[in-house]
């Protein structure tokens, strides 16, 4: 039985990210709800060049659907990292719900490092950059894995010191 040394679950819960999204969503929904009400309930065309009633129903539904999907993704997306004595396991639902297992034998080098998510990977999330793949949701600290096959993976963490401790125990367990 593998011994779990570390586990972390991270979500996209940054206020600087949520506030603009909520403002945009509320603005879009209110605008289309007003247009829907004005044209279909009151009976007056909405705007200088109004779309058909069917087009407005479709567009309003699409706006609600898109924003619903965005908020669903933000609510359900989480990065789950587990470090065991002989492997690292990662899940990033809804992008991949099946656990990815990385045996220690595949890893050439691993270290906790500071990184720049924007310049190195183009932001947060499931990212691809010149230095390899990154799974991150916030911050600028990550577990850098360099594989024996030449590929690289960075896993973001908010608990760098705990990850350092876990990988030191992991290496000793091999």
Feature-to-residue mapping (PLM):
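Short, flexible segments with low predicted structural confidence
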Residues: 52-54, 59-60, 78-80, 116-117, ...
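Glycine-centered small-residue hotspots that permit tight backbone geometry or close packing
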Residues: 43, 124-125, 156
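N-terminal membrane-targeting/pre-transmembrane regions
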Residues: 1-54, 169
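A membrane-cytosol interface segment of integral membrane proteins
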Residues: 3, 129-174
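Non-transmembrane, membrane-adjacent beta-strand/coil modules in membrane-associated proteins
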Residues: 9-12, 90-151
């Amino acid at each position: 039985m593998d011994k779990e040394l570390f586990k972390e679950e991270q979500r996209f819960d940054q206020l600087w990210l949520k506030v603009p999204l909520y403002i945009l969503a509320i603005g879009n929904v209110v605008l289309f709800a007003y247009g829907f009400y004005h044209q279909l309930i009151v009976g007056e065309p909405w705007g200088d060049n109004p779309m058909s009633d069917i087009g407005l129903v479709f567009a309003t539904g699409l706006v609600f659907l898109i924003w619903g999907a965005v908020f669903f993704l933000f609510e359900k997306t989480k990065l789950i990292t587990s470090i065991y004595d002989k492997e690292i396991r990662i899940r990033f639902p809804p992008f991949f719900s099946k656990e990815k297992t990385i045996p220690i034998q595949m890893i050439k080098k691993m270290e906790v490092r500071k990184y720049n998510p924007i310049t190195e990977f183009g932001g947060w999330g499931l990212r691809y950059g010149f230095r390899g793949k990154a799974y991150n949701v916030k911050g600028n600290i990550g577990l850098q894995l360099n594989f024996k096959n030449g590929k690289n993976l960075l896993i973001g963490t908010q608990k760098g010191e705990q990850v350092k401790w876990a990988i030191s125990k992991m290496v000793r367990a091999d």
